[in-house]
Amino acid sequence: MPRNTALEKYRNIGICAHVDAGKTTTTERILFYTGLSHKIGEVHDGAATMDWMEQEQERGITITSAATTTFWSGMDQQFEKHRINIIDTPGHVDFTIEVERSLRVLDGAVVVFCGSSGVEPQSETVWRQANKYGVPRIVFVNKMDRSGADFERVCAQIKTRLKANVVPVQLNIGAEEDFKGVIDLIRMKAIMWNEEDMGLTYELVDIPADLQDRAEELRMEMIEAAAEASEELMEKYLEGGELSEDEIHQGLRARVLNNEIVLAFCGSAFKNKGVQAVLDGVVRYLPAPNQVPAIKCETEDGEPASRPSSDDAPFAALAFKLATDPFVGNLTFIRVYSGVLKSGDAVYNPVKGKKERVGRIVQMHANKRDEIKEVRAGDIAACIGLKDVTTGDTLCDQEDVVILEKMDFPEPVISVAVEPKSKADQEKMSIALGKLAAEDPSFRVKTDEESGQTIISGMGELHLDIVVDRMRREFKVEANVGNPQVAYRETIRSKVEQEAKFVRQSGGRGQYGHVFVRFEPLDEVDENGEAKVFKFVDEVVGGVVPKEYIGSVAKGIEEQLNNGVLAGYPMIGVKATLYDGSYHDVDSSEMAFKIAGSMALKEGAKKANACILEPIMKVEVVTPEDYLGDVMGDLNRRRGIIEGMDENPSGRVINALVPLAEMFGYATNVRSISQGRASFSMEFKKYAEVPNNIADEIIKSHNS
């Protein structure tokens, strides 16, 4: 079966932005103008086509990236039909993982900014992620009808804050409630969209006299930017001071594809103005799958390789998202980089080392689906029937195995205990959490061995709220959620020798175990470089403690280690040496020596200066210069130690070590200190001793 659309006419794009820049509305308008969605879904009615999870419609924010396929031939039908695959991405900081995952599989992006609030914190995060994956992008300054909207101010902010080389290809006519249309700087005409038919048709009119001069200045800047694309264009421009429309398009496209410039468009999606021109921009300036560098991968032996975007190359695709669908079960969204996959084909998953069969393939439109027979290089689709696939896995031809880059997922930073409200829900809860964890790699589930509780961990408080919410709605499990927890540990600080004797006489056979144990701090690491928890050494000579009882002594010490000696937290970093003791022919038993061992640790640890340890996190905060002092002051108040500072395009980077116990609520706090412009990440670094006053409180709360 030949291709319906040539690969050059594909565009895989993401629409990304900060919460509330109007990203979902922009996507809705794209679906409307491309003829897919006859009634435009308004976000504030909770009816947007792309926001298909209930929580999204309720909160008016987009949580999961829905993928949609649509077609466009231009505002004047000036292009052949192009196929545009769109991924709508969330803008909330707790869901950065979704954005990262989408950018990984896109060829280009439209970044939406609000005309009045301009560059916001999440836009800085998204921009950083797009830089990381080298994604060419164009900018749409939306909400030009809002009060305070100013297109040129937002372009200037993008230059200074995001260090991007912005080239406007349009200029707005009026702003706020007087926003009427845009000037096309390439054709030097004003575009006025028809309000009667929701902007489906438009008129080209002369540029208003008061904007003529500014339009000409901006046009000169744009032509200079286009001319820098090649020596031929530069020569032509220097000779005649002008370029033809085609040459301008050609020059701008070449520079966008090289990530040298970012073109800026403006409009108001809500008022049906400007989105159509952005669609033309996507076709004109963003790359087709075969115009971006071939995807890098590794062979099974770890040798570097790459896969060209071609149907003739062996099949390779990346599973970039999993979703559970109420009707068909698991959906695995894939981006096909090379080759062809037909429904019913077997694929190999080198990450899991398993072969799987693809049942059906569907093309998604938000959450409606059309079944298709095959997918080819450049396609984005969802497979039904894959059982053991995790986000970030590669699917490939079994005869020609490659592993695409693994996605790096951040470690969760916050944990809470959850328990089902009724015993009957226990199993349902386990199944629900398992499914949610497979869908979202930044969310983890584990059972705490000490308390038997189920602990869930994620990227932030909103992230975990939504997980608990989805358990309730999709899996009908009601759960109670505890407060965020810290995993403390205990250890000893000095060397001590301890005698312990367990003797019981109560008529008949008694109990007798007698040991001398030396306890000292253990500073050894295992083969992974992790600190060792416990080491037991046997130095008994002359059989004063018989061989068969030595294991019992070790076991008694180890059991007591798990229960701690100060506040019930497990002890780590302890070396125990059994060097003497005595036994009784009749009364000694394994049990007696086990109890003697645990008594020795209980008594000895107190003399060996036992103390409490807490997890210390490596925290990195990126903040604009203006808030540096406040952010550092706040870290100091949290018992943080500032290790160093760096510069980066988004501001200053502070590296600090901060106790986890002081980091709860930090996400909300750092946002309010920096008016939402600072972002942070943290990961576990080491255990360190807790200050005495805090240790006293921990022990007190344990004993009460």
Swiss-Prot record:
One of its GO terms (molecular function) is translation elongation factor activity. Keywords: Cytoplasm, Elongation factor, GTP-binding, Nucleotide-binding, Protein biosynthesis. It holds the Pfam family GTP_EFTU. GTP binds at residues 17-24, 88-92, 142-145. Transmembrane segments: none annotated. One of its GO terms (biological process) is ribosome disassembly. Residues 8-290 form the tr-type G domain. It is found in: Cytoplasm. GO terms for cellular component: cytoplasm. Its main location: cytoplasm. Belongs to the TRAFAC class translation factor GTPase superfamily. Classic translation factor GTPase family. EF-G/EF-2 subfamily. Catalyzes the GTP-dependent ribosomal translocation step during translation elongation. During this step, the ribosome changes from the pre-translocational (PRE) to the post-translocational (POST) state as the newly formed A-site-bound peptidyl-tRNA and P-site-bound deacylated tRNA move to the P and E sites, respectively. Catalyzes the coordinated movement of the two tRNA molecules, the mRNA and conformational changes in the ribosome. HAMAP family: EF_G_EF_2_B. This is Elongation factor G.
